[in-house]
């Protein structure tokens, strides 16, 4: 493409070789800038990513979990399945996914939902008021939602997250639980 670059005279007071070199650098910069802008737009506007493997397909979508349809939605609760939404440290934050879910779908009797699936409490009690707690990853179906015991509670009722090993154990339990309850539907997890 010497001919293409030779047609452009960017500076009239320099040799043709310098003009060709400047035209090449300018073309490179233009292509680079357009590539960066195109990639930035793609990353900004993409809404989903699909990961496929042997015997599974995971689709990661960006959006409001509570607005998803035709799927089972996993809503994470604390280890005691607290249903009180409010501002106290032991309450569910109204801005969290769990808080938004509970405000749209109040649960009057969580214990009956737990009893209906014969979910056994964990061997130890919660650090928060010695309440019954459930292993992280265990699910309780409620309509199109699967309510998951997740965050452990400290003595003040605040949720905290566990070590890498405990997190992996939680995921292992979760996958087994999903296998029981998903009913051949897609599953959306926050």
Q: Which stretches of residues belong to each language-model region?
A:
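Macrodomain-like recognition of ADP-ribose-binding/processing modules
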Residues: 1-188
